């Protein structure tokens, strides 16, 4: 369950947005970046983006998270309305410390899936129930989900969110993230 706390204007290089802050029952803040009026609308472009300190903030090239975030904001900002739900779920939900430990294991030759399993952690521990709550908070009729992740599609549909379209995010791989993206496609079913 989420609770709305505050909002403010957020002018950005990607357009005019408002930022909403919600807290969940784990007392984590989740940011929702909204462009235009999404209340009660259909076919709202929505990106559910999980926090990635190394990629989003530090510009790590081990993943494509920052590029996905930027491309999503550009797309949403170019539409009449849309939203990005920024979930505080670092490292596919395992937290920053375990993510850095996974990086170390990847440096030793494991892939991203094997690195989590080696630590006794799930491959992906993210939860999308708060995203469902946010979409319902805005009374959105249907969404166009900006994602490559089939698990997000499945979860949202199973929890009553009508998805009219999947919008893929195609980011050309680099020599640094090519193996990571290949693992996401082959072992996690991501749709590129």
Swiss-Prot record:
Q: Give the UniProt entry's GO cellular component terms.
A: cytosol
Give the molecular function GO annotations: 3,4-dihydroxy-2-butanone-4-phosphate synthase activity; GTP binding; GTP cyclohydrolase II activity; zinc ion binding
Q: Which reaction does it catalyse?
A: GTP + 4 H2O = 2,5-diamino-6-hydroxy-4-(5-phosphoribosylamino)-pyrimidine + formate + 2 phosphate + 3 H(+)
Pathway assigned in UniProt: Cofactor biosynthesis; riboflavin biosynthesis; 5-amino-6-(D-ribitylamino)uracil from GTP: step 1/4
Kindly give the Pfam families that the UniProt entry links to this protein. Answer: GTP_cyclohydro2
Which top-level group of life is the source organism from? Archaea
- Residues the record lists as binding GTP: 47-51, 68, 90-92, 112, 147, 152
Positions of the catalytic residues: 124, 126
List residues binding Zn(2+): 52, 63, 65
InterPro entries named in the record: GTP_cyclohydro_II, RibA, RibA-like_sf
Q: Which cofactor does it need?
A: Zn(2+)
EC id: 3.5.4.25
Keyword annotations from UniProtKB, A to Z: GTP-binding, Hydrolase, Metal-binding, Nucleotide-binding, Riboflavin biosynthesis, Zinc
Biological processes annotated in GO: riboflavin biosynthetic process
Q: How is the cofactor bound?
A: Binds 1 zinc ion per subunit.
What is the stated purpose of this protein? Catalyzes the conversion of GTP to 2,5-diamino-6-ribosylamino-4(3H)-pyrimidinone 5'-phosphate (DARP), formate and pyrophosphate.
Q: Which family does it belong to?
A: Belongs to the GTP cyclohydrolase II family.
Protein name (Swiss-Prot/TrEMBL): GTP cyclohydrolase-2
């Amino acid at each position: 369950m989420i609770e709305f706390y505050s909002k403010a204007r957020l002018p950005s290089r990607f357009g005019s947005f408002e930022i909403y802050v919600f807290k969940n029952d784990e007392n984590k803040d989740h940011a929702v970046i909204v462009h235009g009026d999404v209340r009660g609308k259909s076919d709202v472009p929505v990106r559910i983006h999980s926090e990635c300190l190394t990629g989003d903030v530090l510009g790590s090239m081990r993943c494509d998270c920052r590029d996905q975030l930027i491309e999503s904001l550009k797309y949403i900002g170019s539409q009449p309305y849309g939203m990005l739900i920024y979930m505080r779920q670092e490292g596919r939900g395992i937290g920053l410390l375990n993510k850095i430990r996974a990086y170390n294991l990847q440096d030793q030759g494991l892939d991203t899936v094997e690195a989590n399993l080696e630590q006794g952690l799930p491959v992906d521990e993210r939860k999308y129930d708060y995203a469902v709550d946010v979409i319902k908070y805005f009374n959105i009729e249907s969404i166009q989900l900006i994602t490559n992740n089939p698990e997000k599609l499945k979860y949202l549909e199973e929890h009553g969110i009508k998805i009219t379209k999947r919008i893929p995010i195609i980011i050309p791989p680099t020599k640094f993230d090519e193996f990571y993206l290949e693992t996401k496609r082959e072992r996690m079913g991501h749709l590129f």
